Amino acid sequence: VHMARNMXVPPXXAD
């Protein structure tokens, strides 16, 4: 589940 670490990260850079 990488969505949990993208909380603050905008799409694109959130890998």
UniProtKB/Swiss-Prot annotation:
Catalytic activity: a ubiquinone + NADH + 5 H(+)(in) = a ubiquinol + NAD(+) + 4 H(+)(out)
First-level EC class: translocase
Alphabetized GO MF terms: NADH dehydrogenase (ubiquinone) activity
Gene Ontology CC, one term: mitochondrial inner membrane
Enzyme Commission no: 7.1.1.2
Membrane topology reported for the UniProt record: Peripheral membrane protein
Signal peptide: none
Protein localization: Mitochondrion inner membrane
Keywords: Membrane, Mitochondrion, Mitochondrion inner membrane, NAD, Oxidoreductase, Translocase, Ubiquinone
Chain's role: Transfer of electrons from NADH to the respiratory chain. The immediate electron acceptor for the enzyme is believed to be ubiquinone.
Assembly and binders: Complex I is composed of about 45 different subunits.
Protein name per the record: NADH-ubiquinone oxidoreductase 12 kDa subunit
Organism for this UniProt entry: Solanum tuberosum (Potato)
